[in-house]
Amino acid sequence: LDVKKDWSDHALWWEKKKTWLLKTHWTLDKYGIQADAKLQFTPQHKLLRLQLPNMKYVKVKVNFSDRVFKAVSDICKTFNIRHPEELSLLRKPRDPSKKKKKKLDDQCEDDAFELEGPLITPGSGNIYSSPGLYSKTMTPTYDAHDGSPLSPTSAWFGDSALSEGNPGILAVSQPVTSPESLAKMYKPQALLDKAKINQGWLDSSRSLMEQEVKENEALLLRFKYYSFFDLNPKYDAIRINQLYEQSKWAILLEEIECTEEEMMMFAALQYHINKLSIMSSENHLNNSDKDVDEVDAALLDLEITLEGGKTSTILGDITSIPELADYIKVFKPKKLTLKGYKPYWCTFKDTSISCYKSKEESNGTPAHQMNLRGCEVTPDVNISGQKFNIKLLIPVAEGMNEIWLRCDNETQYASWMAACRLASKGKTMADSSYGMEVQNILSFLKMQHLNPDPQLIPEQINTDINPECLVSPRYLKKYKNKQITARILEAHQNVAQMSLIEAKMRFIQAWQSLPEFGITHFIARFQGGKKEELIGIAYNRLIRMDASTGDAVKTWRFSNMKQWNVNWEIKMVTVEFADDVRVSFICTEVDCKVVHEFIGGYIFLSTRAKDQNESLDEEMFYKLTSGWV
């Protein structure tokens, strides 16, 4: 047949062995292929339906023969998302409470969230800035005030149909369309349900075809690792928006716990962001060539970048380490006593707190002393009730000692909470991040304050609020819509002056401040244990947790880790720490490879530095996460 076709994208796929025959210099005999083997000559690039963190679907053509890590990098490059190593692909979780539906029903549900337009192909067109890189000479691609694109749209979406109409659709927040759509979504009811969701993470070291992903299958693109490097409004409008969306949905679907005051603060920020997103879209339709004051943009960038670089203009004596000393109420709940909090004169030096019965006795021997290195620090705050508690779980040989500290006011709480958080990481108050940590805590508390003059809230804006789309179902059951609306509008007064990007960054910061933030749960059985427990993995530690309450039983820091390995035959993960501490567990609901990849992935992310201008070291990632390279 005289048919002209480009076969360059095709390759041989061996279905029986689940492998691609990509080494064209190898003979079939070297691959071990016999005469009865069935080989499929198929395109390597196939369509995939990706659900983005904002819950919208977009069709993408992805290389099914690339390892997932490389495929995700290509997808992020197309979407202009820097640091693709933080994201990965996840299979859609099934709601166990619902009966099995027909595929057609699922498709109809998904179509309600379909983005208009485009098929986006990784690699098509020029990419404006190379994701995964950091460079001081990078040209800003977004307005640091509202996140709108500064570049010609074709520069970062190529010839894609996304460059028509609204080019910044991926950088624009999508409000929840209706309470009904929110109600249909799967909400994990317990910690075990949250742990089961993590069964769905794909293996980053194997290709999509090897993991039986089909063409046109729906997968979720999510931030997998909760370590967000160099979030910068000038380059990361899409990344920041998708991160905001992921955090927003985590709160609305109750995947992470928050207090009532925090929920109203999150709702107020959402309301503010939704309003500004509409205004920003309208402004840029009318004024697409708006000039940006580079000095203002740089100052704003310094103000609200989550990580890095702020140094105090007042330099104290660099040889001295700051200390805290004040009366603090201390409580040990595990002691068999009816006594409550007892006031002590407490001094915080280095990473230790010493408690004295009075200020006058502070030169003598302390009544209690605790080293906070490696401890778990959890806030317990109620602004309206003036409750400012710090819960400490301090590691000891037999488990964790629980200590509660009660502060008198916000200022005292912020200073001591910041010191506790740094001490848990082995840092002192001399660390440059201490002042910023104190300010972040105070800012977080300030956003939760009730407005003393609710009558100042204009009546006319009450009508454009839909509380059913701004708070989680738990609070909808607890209060009437009118009550929730009033509280959201009160909380909105604390954030009303923020710019669009600042509001998103504040939302992400507040999400990061929640006690449960950044912990990925897995169901596990520990060596010597008789029942199923939870293993929690965070960016800097492993946590053994009670499966019913979520309380930490024991914590181990990665900074003390010597090595970890997997016995692939019995599916056991073993982690060795300093002082001959050895932790072994079997994952009961998930392949141990997923847990191994989380540990190795966080170690890989901890090696990143701002002065690196080279691209990602893929081979290093595979060495740390694949287990067999």
PLM feature spans:
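Conserved, structured regulatory domains from eukaryotic proteins
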Residues: L21, P43-L48, K98-P122, E180-L208, ...
